[in-house]
Amino acid sequence: MRTSDSHLPLSNLARSDSIEFKDAVINEKWVHSANRRKGHLTPKAPEKKSGWFGGQKSEEELLMERVEQHELEELQTFIAQKLFRVDGIICDEETRILLVEKLMNAKEYPTINHDELAHRYGSSMAGWLRDRLVPSMSDCSSVLQRAAAEFYQNKMSDPLCNWGQLNPEHVSMVAARIAKFSEEMSSKVKWSLLVEPGKFSCHLTEFVQEFNRLDRMFVSNELSDEESLQTAFNANYLTKARSKMVPCAEFSRVKLNDGLGRLDDRNELRNGMFSDEHEFLQEEGYTAKSTYGTTDFIHANYVKGGPLLNTFICAQAPLKNTQEDFWRMVFQEKCQFIVMLNSAVDSSTLGPLDSANRNHCPYYWPRAENESLRFGSFHITCMKVDSKADPLFTITKLKVQKVGGNLLDAEFDEELFLEHWQWDWQYLGDVHWPFRVLRKARQLSTPTIVQCIDGCSKSGTLVSIETALMHFIRGSPITKSLILQSCVFVRLQRRLSVSSVLLYLFIYRVILRWIEPYVNKWYHRAALGLRFKSIGFIQKYNAMIQEFSRITPAY
């Protein structure tokens, strides 16, 4: 974060402590050296003004310490996750080879082949795997330098990182919004001796009640006729929706206007749903040749307007029969960035019972370099696999080509290049990754597709985080319940977004991560868990996700 002494109202943002993040390799000396080579996003702290008895640190110095400490922790986490991923791949490959050795009775056993690793994980990750096979961390300086360079990529142009360079009036406005939000959030943290008898601890009841308000919002407040309309969904949900309980609003849905879709035969659909013994379905009106659905429907909605800098599309994971529709949408909207937050399976490996389960997402994109797939009029080619640019996501660079009027013609009319980021997000304790994903989305002028199984829970959470963050930078003056307002804004356009209280709390936790250096008051820092690790919002949140999700991070 780059700041300016003449711009920031530092007296409103300072505090009186700094936490030392200890690491044998990636310490302050190392990161400052790296920053001089790559360019630092924060200015050097002012020199300490000392008097006869050593003096006292100024508010400006304390703020600079917190900002630099915040960025250092981000960098350390990024590199630690990246190195853990490399070690995990190496461990998996060595385990695979060991198992093959035990099962095979041969003179020569397989080894870790660089070309095979490049095919599976991309050439960049294969280089990381090679460089990581060294005896100690002290030999990994080049690896760490490459990771630091990737961490700082695109940060200089990110409004979340450079808002301190704006005009003083705008900076004061952002600082006031941060102060107001931290005050409101800390006031919702309540304390009690009864939650854990004999121990003074906090509870998050008010946050849970706020989520319940969100859940009842559209029940208590009737939508207009235009907002409640879902005509296309009602005409297509049997074949193109994973659940009829997750509607698709008509006014914000993505309409496919190329006319390339196909319609299902109503009789075939009926026979697949009911047995022949249902005689009431054999009447003349039901046996006539007819079709079901429309060609312009896909279960996806735009989320745009308000404080957002760019447009998002929240979409459900493609079904086996809607993969072509998905690529129709990608090509129509000229999307350059797809964020996939769920796992996928190979449809050919599923049995009859598994195939009937609509909770599976097929591999709708080619995963190996130079591999291609064809869906109707669209030819998708994997240009490159990059498993090292981000420590969590597998990045596939794709080329989408549309066949001309003659479907047998090998020539393509148009081409589209995009990046597909895939990660099965389950653990709610990592609050760093949304900033990396959203930073890339802000750089693009075309819509960003955010996709999970239902297109609402995880997808809506990520877009709600962006909505809340942009409220600080360019939104209207914050009154109350910023997170609630942001989620209502997203839910109005994409129904049932942010489907659980844990996802709702995750939004608060991510926003808290961003404002952390700028929270100045002692009580606010204590209530939010920024001053003491054993009490406050952060401690209670971590306990809740461990209790309810039962998932721990791999790193």
From Swiss-Prot:
Residue ranges annotated for the Tyrosine-protein phosphatase domain, each copy included? 207-514
Q: What happens when the gene is disrupted?
A: RNAi-mediated knockdown causes hermaphrodite sterility characterized by the production of oocytes lacking an eggshell. Prevents the polarized dispersal of cortical F-actin following oocyte fertilization without affecting the formation of the F-actin cap. Impairs egg-4 and egg-5 cortical localization in oocytes. Causes a loss of kinase mbk-2 cortical localization in oocyte in meiosis I. RNAi-mediated knockdown in a mat-1 (ax227) mutant background, restores mbk-2 cytoplasmic relocalization and mbk-2-mediated degradation of pos-1 and mei-1.
Cross-referenced InterPro entries:
Oocyte-zygote_transition_reg, Prot-tyrosine_phosphatase-like, PTP_cat, Tyr_Pase_cat
Report the residue ranges where the short sequence motif RXXL motif is annotated in this entry.
253-256, 266-269, 509-512, 525-528
Q: Which GO terms describe its biological process?
A: cortical actin cytoskeleton organization; eggshell formation; oocyte maturation; polar body extrusion after meiotic divisions; positive regulation of protein localization to cell cortex
Q: What does this protein do?
A: Probable pseudophosphatase required for the oocyte-to-zygote transition during which it regulates the polarized dispersal of the cortical actin cytoskeleton, the synthesis of the eggshell chitin layer and the formation of the polar bodies after meiosis I and II. Acts as a scaffold to tether kinase mbk-2 and pseudophosphatases egg-4 and egg-5 to the oocyte cortex and thus restricts mbk-2 activity to the cortex during meiosis I. Regulates mbk-2 localization to cytoplasmic foci during meiosis II.
> What is the name attached to this protein's record?
Protein tyrosine phosphatase-like protein egg-3
Organism of this sequence:
Caenorhabditis elegans
